[in-house]
Amino acid sequence: MEKLEKLISTYENYPKAGVSFKDVIEIVQHPSIFRQLILEMAKSKIIKEAEALISIDARGFIFGSAISIQAAKPMIVARKPGKLPGELVTKKYSLEYGENSLSIQKKALKKYNSFAIIDDLLATGGTVNCVSELINNNNKKVVGLLVVAELSKFDGRSRFNFPVESSILF
């Protein structure tokens, strides 16, 4: 999707020095392109094989919600600290530019056995690895990952034993 690539901006030294941040948010300002992206992502074999989607805080929610509606699949969320009520499963992880943790509500995780992970971007794979470990540690299965953009120089996909699909490869 050539038009899609032109809508992804690069911000140097954000959120810290040495990081080249790819921002996919402009895609949602172009409804016809956004719609086409969601239609394509929702057709994925990964989505068809999953019982539910797990979208990652926060930009993953944008794409995950739209895919969830299009594919008629339930969506649960992996959130940053302090953002979810109730009993949680939580894991820390390292980022390209720091450390964080993600949580998933236990009751949401218990309802389904197989998940497609949805996020905006794959770089080192730290965030996705955190979510996949949360899923696997609860005797559930990750059937694959869908991202809008992938930064191939980080080879994040090599960390996973499940399929990875990206709409744009940088």
Curated annotation (Swiss-Prot):
It is an enzyme of class 2 (transferase). Its main location: cytoplasm. GO terms for molecular function: adenine binding; adenine phosphoribosyltransferase activity; AMP binding. SUPFAM superfamilies: PRTase-like. GO terms for biological process: adenine salvage; AMP salvage; purine ribonucleoside salvage. Catalyzes a salvage reaction resulting in the formation of AMP, that is energically less costly than de novo synthesis. Belongs to the purine/pyrimidine phosphoribosyltransferase family. This is Adenine phosphoribosyltransferase.
